[in-house]
């Protein structure tokens, strides 16, 4: 509630300035990594992954109510983005593989995490990590993953809301224009930069969002079966919102975390209080009200991955 109030009262220019400061704090570890003793990988980190607008922020906020967990006060991509910004790789995409981990990068990331989590388990939520699971496994060999899935129509509609909420959620200023977005046309890209984005430069918004949903979820499904089931935890957005207390308690048990009073209180509040990133109150068939005709056009495109996800 307090965070939502601050968001309403504080001008976005001020919030963005504060965000830039917070974004750069973990980078203090970069020069220190050259002189500090070598840090070991954090033990059993937890990565919350899922397509943008699938509810990953809600899940992260719930996990951070645990006294056993700590994040770096921002999405984890700020740790490795200096090493792997898309502009340094021909603006290809946000995808990274195991071979992309560098020696100096490894020492810097380990030190930065150790500085900020201070003995607790590291937890992170970064939607781009849907495209980076092999990279994360190379950096953090004993990591666990919490994969949040959401029904295709609802998720794509929420992505469309996010794209329209400029300047929020803009991730990159591309070297080439997007020309099929009407008033949103231009070089700005929101959320995950997916492989093959250049083929979408003339595509309408609903197709870009559908392709983001497909790319994020298909990448996860391709690698999921190769990970020890004890380190992989599926959560459905629909279950999280319909029965948050039971869903979060079950997840905490699977992750070996204590389900304390603060966690329980937060879980109970989710039925009435959406996340601070929620753009409009949740309700049944909201996607039909907001973006029905557009989303219906891409439902055939979404159907195969939706079936693989159990929808």
Predicted regions and their residues:
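PAPS-dependent sulfotransferase catalytic core
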Residues: 1-111, 116, 164-169, 175-176, ...
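PAPS-dependent sulfotransferases, especially Golgi type II membrane carbohydrate sulfotransferases
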Residues: 1-45, 168-311
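Hydrophobic/aromatic beta-strand patches that form the interior of the parallel beta-sheet core
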Residues: 46, 70, 144-146, 233-235
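Short beta-strand segments
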Residues: 50, 122-125, 147-149, 234-236
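Short catalytic/ligand-binding loop motif for oxyanion handling, primarily in non-cytosolic enzymes
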Residues: 57-60, 78-81, 130-133, 153-158, ...
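Acidic-histidine catalytic/liganding microenvironments
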Residues: 66-67, 140, 227-229
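Glycine-rich phosphate-binding loop used to anchor ATP phosphates in small-molecule kinases
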Residues: 109-135
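Conserved phosphate-donor/acceptor-positioning beta-strand/loop module used by diverse small-molecule
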Residues: 125, 136-162
